[in-house]
Amino acid sequence: YQGKNEVVLYLSGKLNINGVDIDGLIIKEDAIVLVEFKNYAGEIKAQANGDWFHGSERINGGAKKKDGSTKTVFEQLKINRRALRDGLSRYIKNEDACNNIQALVVFSSISSLKLDEEFKWGANAWVNVSDVEHICEELDTIKARTRSNKSIILTDGDIFDFIRSKGLDERYIITKYSDTNVMPGDLFHEEFAHNGDDFSPNVLL
């Protein structure tokens, strides 16, 4: 994203990981980030125990429970995070990064945010909330750490090896938003077909 020299991989579209659909995945030098988009604007209340709210309206997490009710946003995030961890561990050998995946829930716009204290520190501090306008600023603050407070470090090589192992060739690159100059020669050939300004096709992980 703008002003950053690090390599950042962003996969968009409908991603299916171990049977679970997620909206996006970001891999950067200090975190793997699960991205979920919510089409709500205004006052947002996000909490670890209980429902999330848009004003007085409950925000559904997505999947249904056995009793027919839908999971909370946080419950769904935990499910998706576990699925992502298990799915990525076959391709990314950095165990600390896979075991400490972060989440970023992005709303259309937020006029006020009441964020549970549990999301600010402690075991659930992996949950982050932003809106579309401030997504880059929030992403910059997301830095994964282990339980022993060790920083997560993913090298450019880790990211490029993931691209290779998943076979993400030119067809998947949106060149309008990508700096293809940083890519190794075996991963991008300008003369081959690529997406250009279009959205990339779905990726099955």
Map each language-model feature to its residues.
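Surface-exposed interaction regions that form or flank ligand-binding interfaces
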Residues: 1-21, 26-33, 38-48, 53-205
